[in-house]
Amino acid sequence: VNCGQVNKALSSCVPFLTGFDTTPSLTCCAGVMELKRLAPTVKDKRIACECVKTAAARYPNIREDAASSLPYKCGVVINVPISKTTNCHEIN
């Protein structure tokens, strides 16, 4: 997995993550599902996590509550936290 793939998967989620939209779009949720598919191993999950943190840092107005609720709102169980503050090395 690389950051280009992660960024592409989650790019359509920015309106939801910044509070512009109240629910994630179908395209956004498809991206969350793609992120899950891209990161099957612990190593992949840690890399994806770092990519998410780097991408989130470019958007200072990302709402942490929206980010943490994104997988749940999309109905996707994913072991890659979507957060600016996650310690990615703690992912198992």
Curated annotation (Swiss-Prot):
Keyword annotations from UniProtKB, A to Z: Disulfide bond, Lipid-binding, Transport
List the GO biological process terms.
lipid transport
Which InterPro entries does the protein's record reference? Bifun_inhib/LTP/seed_sf (IPR036312), Bifunc_inhib/LTP/seed_store (IPR016140), Plant_nsLTP (IPR000528)
Disulfide connectivity for this sequence is 3-51, 13-28, 29-74, 49-88
Report the Pfam families cross-referenced here. Answer: Tryp_alpha_amyl
Q: Which GO terms describe its molecular function?
A: lipid binding
What the record says about family reads: Belongs to the plant LTP family.
Q: What the protein does? A: Plant non-specific lipid-transfer proteins transfer phospholipids as well as galactolipids across membranes. May play a role in wax or cutin deposition in the cell walls of expanding epidermal cells and certain secretory tissues.
Q: What is this protein called?
A: Non-specific lipid-transfer protein B
Instruction: Write down the species.
Output: Ricinus communis (Castor bean)
